[in-house]
């Protein structure tokens, strides 16, 4: 009986075929979906690594940020508020007029100005703001003989309406907005302001309080009719 046997070449070919079949069974063809999944996994891994690498003390605290913002805002507003304090009182609604047709002068606290008390704390040459006619800031003037002048000087610049401070060193009213200047009586001596500061009568009533009364007569500084009447 003849036995059948395979030649070495045939056996080698069969082994190669078997290995190729096994390899093809294990090999998975890459698809678009597989690429997307791998990419997402890599991105997620990178983000996770970055987030976990930030120290806890470097993470912004929202409450701290709010507090710092408020402190910064307060710091910025302080200088402006401080500069406005001397003039803020004079932008409140004006008080009612006096019984004699005048308007009581009010100090920075809103109290009536009593002439005798005022002169105790304001010396010769003093010019201090009070609230006058229609609520306008108005300077009370102390004469060299330690008496109150019979006129008050409206502090509103005739250029664009800024409140004009008194400069004692230069003995002038100097407007900080555009450089207008007025002498000690409020007469304009340098533009761009076109006119002198307005006047008001400063009278003293029976109770010793200072009253401002509208000035309708000739302006004694210029000899002209009052432009503000």
Curated annotation (Swiss-Prot):
GO terms for biological process: nonphotochemical quenching; photosynthetic electron transport chain. This is Cytochrome b6-f complex iron-sulfur subunit, chloroplastic. The keyword tRNA-binding does not apply. Binds 1 [2Fe-2S] cluster per subunit. Changing residue 194 to L: In pgr1; reduces electron transfer from cyt b6/f to photosystem I at high light intensity, and shifts pH-dependent inactivation of electron transport to more alkaline pH. The 4 large subunits of the cytochrome b6-f complex are cytochrome b6, subunit IV (17 kDa polypeptide, petD), cytochrome f and the Rieske protein, while the 4 small subunits are petG, petL, petM and petN. The complex functions as a dimer. Interacts with PGRL1A. Component of a mitochondrial large protein complex that contains, at least, MIC60, DGS1, TOM40, TOM20 proteins, and petC/RISP. It is a single-pass membrane protein. Keywords: 2Fe-2S, Chloroplast, Disulfide bond, Electron transport, Iron, Iron-sulfur, Membrane, Metal-binding, Mitochondrion, Mitochondrion inner membrane, Phosphoprotein, Plastid, Thylakoid, Transit peptide, Translocase, Transmembrane, Transmembrane helix, Transport. Its EC number is 7.1.1.6. GO terms for cellular component: chloroplast; chloroplast envelope; chloroplast thylakoid; chloroplast thylakoid membrane; cytochrome b6f complex; cytosol; membrane; mitochondrial inner membrane. Disulfide bonds join 162-177. HAMAP family: Cytb6_f_Rieske. It is found in: Plastid, Chloroplast thylakoid membrane; Mitochondrion inner membrane.
């Amino acid at each position: 009986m003849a036995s059948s046997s395979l030649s070495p070449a045939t056996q080698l070919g069969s082994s190669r075929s078997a290995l190729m079949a096994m390899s093809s069974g294990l090999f998975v063809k890459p698809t678009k979906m597989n690429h997307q999944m791998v990419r997402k996994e890599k991105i997620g891994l990178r983000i996770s690594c970055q987030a976990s690498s930030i120290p806890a003390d470097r993470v912004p605290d929202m409450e701290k940020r709010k507090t710092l913002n408020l402190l910064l805002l307060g710091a910025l507003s302080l200088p402006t508020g401080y500069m406005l304090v001397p003039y803020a009182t004079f932008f409140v609604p004006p008080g009612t007029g006096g019984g004699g047709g005048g308007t009581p002068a009010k100090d920075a606290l809103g109290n009536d100005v009593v002439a005798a008390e005022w002169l105790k704390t304001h010396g010769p040459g003093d010019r201090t703001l009070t609230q006058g006619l229609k609520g306008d800031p108005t300077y009370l003037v102390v004469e060299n003989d330690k008496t109150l002048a019979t006129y008050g000087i409206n502090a509103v610049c005739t250029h664009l309406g800024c409140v004009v401070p008194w400069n004692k060193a230069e003995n002038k009213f100097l407007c900080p907005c555009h450089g207008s200047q007025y002498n000690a009586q409020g007469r304009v001596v340098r533009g761009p302001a076109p006119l002198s500061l307005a006047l008001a009568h400063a009278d003293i009533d029976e109770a010793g309080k200072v009253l401002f009364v509208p000035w309708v007569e000739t302006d004694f500084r210029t000899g002209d009719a009052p432009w503000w009447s």
